[in-house]
Amino acid sequence: MSNMIKHIDYFPAGYCSSHSGLLFKGIPNEKMQFPAGVFLIHHREKGYILYDTGYHYEIKKKARYFWYRLATPMQMKKEDQIDYLLQERGIDPASISYVILSHLHPDHLGGAALFPNAHFFVTQEVYEVYQKPKLKDLIF
């Protein structure tokens, strides 16, 4: 079973800035950067599996993300988007078989539309939280 995973790669697909006091209790309130990390798992039988998809570049333009951008300003170039990063490594985004989303914030699911051939997975808990989300669930 341990030989099922050929390798795991990490991609920084943009980052946001926020104050630690908004996100964590009991620590000094300092401005911090939070990378939108994406992991690519190369499974011997299942092919390529992504864990999260990072930001989508269009979040910088879409009005519906105004409050998110205000609370957690995001920085990225178009080339930081996960489809570009994969193509730089010679991996066709259409070859991604599965995407596991840790949760449904824009820095984790933003690039989901870039993988139309993939099967998507979330935990039951994530699914239930987003049936009736609170504002904090959508941002932090």
Q: In which residue ranges do the predicted regions lie?
A:
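Structural signal for conserved beta-strand scaffold positions within catalytic alpha/beta enzyme cores
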Residues: Y10-P12, V122
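Active-site HxH/HxHxD metal-binding segment of metal-dependent hydrolases
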Residues: Y48, Y55-F140
